[in-house]
């Protein structure tokens, strides 16, 4: 897989595979650059290298869902269904592997069900966004010094009022 190098930012995750760590970091960099499709491709590559990597599943789940630039209400019905299915399925993979993750990784993973409480779409996902922001507030309270937690918590709040900052 060809890769455009965005830099050396890293977040150490629970994985025995250095190459899975590398591809997770690449996915995180693309995620923070709002190229979610490329982020997902990198997280999937990390999973190829370490199928037990809970955080690679977390990355896919997080990146497949809504964001400040593409909130749920801007998806067309087919796109919303596909995104939710991908996010929900990856979340299940992360949850199934969470026991082997670090405490902060487990907290990030265990916040995801508030973001994706079901696989089927509903008319208005705004309550899901609010529930996820509440879940991330608790993760933040327990991990105030963690930069990723700060980022994900801040983005969860931003997603409550997309394009209104």
Predicted feature descriptions by range:
Residues 1-52, 57-145, 152-165:
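Short coil/linker segments at helix-helix boundaries
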């Amino acid at each position: 897989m060809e890769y455009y190098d965005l830099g050396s930012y890293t977040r150490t995750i629970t994985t025995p595979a250095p190459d899975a760590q590398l591809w997770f970091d690449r996915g995180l960099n693309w995620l923070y650059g709002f190229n979610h499709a490329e982020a997902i491709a990198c997280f999937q590559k990390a999973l190829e290298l370490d199928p037990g990597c809970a955080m690679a599943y977390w990355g896919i789940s997080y990146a497949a869902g809504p964001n400040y630039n593409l909130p749920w209400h801007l998806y067309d019905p087919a796109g919303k269904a596909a995104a939710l299915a991908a996010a929900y399925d990856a979340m299940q993979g992360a949850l199934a592997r969470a026991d082997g993750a670090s405490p902060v990784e487990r907290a990030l993973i265990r916040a995801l069900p508030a973001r994706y409480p079901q696989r089927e779409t509903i008319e208005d996902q705004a309550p899901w966004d609010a529930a996820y922001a509440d879940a991330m507030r608790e993760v933040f309270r327990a991990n105030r010094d963690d930069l990723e937690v700060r980022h994900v918590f801040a983005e969860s709040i931003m997603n409550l009022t997309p394009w209104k900052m």
